Amino acid sequence: MVLTIEALKHLWRLDESRVGRSEPLPLDNRHYVKGHPLCDAFTGLAQIQFGLGCFWGAERLFWQLPGVFSTAAGYAGGGVPYPTYREVCSGETGHAEVVLVVYDHTVISFEQLLQTFWESHDPTQGMRQGNDIGTQYRSVIHCTTSKQYAAASTSREVYQQQLNTAGYTAITTEILHPAPPFYYAENEHQQYLAKHPNGYCGLGGTGVTCPIRLQV
């Protein structure tokens, strides 16, 4: 069964009187690795949100890809505006840890991003990734276009067949369009593993190849 926000609502208690705020958290608007803006209109570039566990390792995974212009760690999919890391980790906001990926589709295809996403985590684990347990670690793809949504949905079906053959259970990845609001994480979480090369990275794939050929 594919998890949706509606199916997840009973797992958390949204209380905007206790958490969240009306203004964004302070942000240094410069990518620590690439030197590009973290927050911008990004005219002429495409955007997508991926959640595949702890955003520290996930963000590094994508900023290393040729054609990716910028990345940012953040929170999305919940009901509380401008949350903090502590609030998200409480499980009361409904948000997932996600990475905003800004890319040049003439250099890297959406297909390549999807392959990286599927092959870099275990999308069958529900509310966890490895030792990281909680609703914030669920697997998500938040699409900014209907074309992305169609491609992501098709890729999930294709990868499910591969996982079935390898003995895995059902994919629990939530795919949404339009993408919910993206809230930037605190400065200390941005490009964390570039600032702390020996820091924690909990990413771990299944070892199953995703053979999609969508050319999106």
Swiss-Prot record:
Its EC number is 1.8.4.11. It catalyses: L-methionyl-[protein] + [thioredoxin]-disulfide + H2O = L-methionyl-(S)-S-oxide-[protein] + [thioredoxin]-dithiol; [thioredoxin]-disulfide + L-methionine + H2O = L-methionine (S)-S-oxide + [thioredoxin]-dithiol. GO terms for cellular component: cytoplasm. One of its GO terms (biological process) is protein modification process. Keywords: Oxidoreductase. The active site is at C54. InterPro entries: Met_Sox_Rdtase_MsrA_dom, Met_Sox_Rdtase_MsrA_sf, MsrA_MetSO_reductase. It is an enzyme of class 1 (oxidoreductase). It holds the Pfam family PMSR. NCBIfam families: msrA. Belongs to the MsrA Met sulfoxide reductase family. Has an important function as a repair enzyme for proteins that have been inactivated by oxidation. Catalyzes the reversible oxidation-reduction of methionine sulfoxide in proteins to methionine. This is Peptide methionine sulfoxide reductase MsrA. It comes from Xylella fastidiosa (strain 9a5c). The gene is msrA.
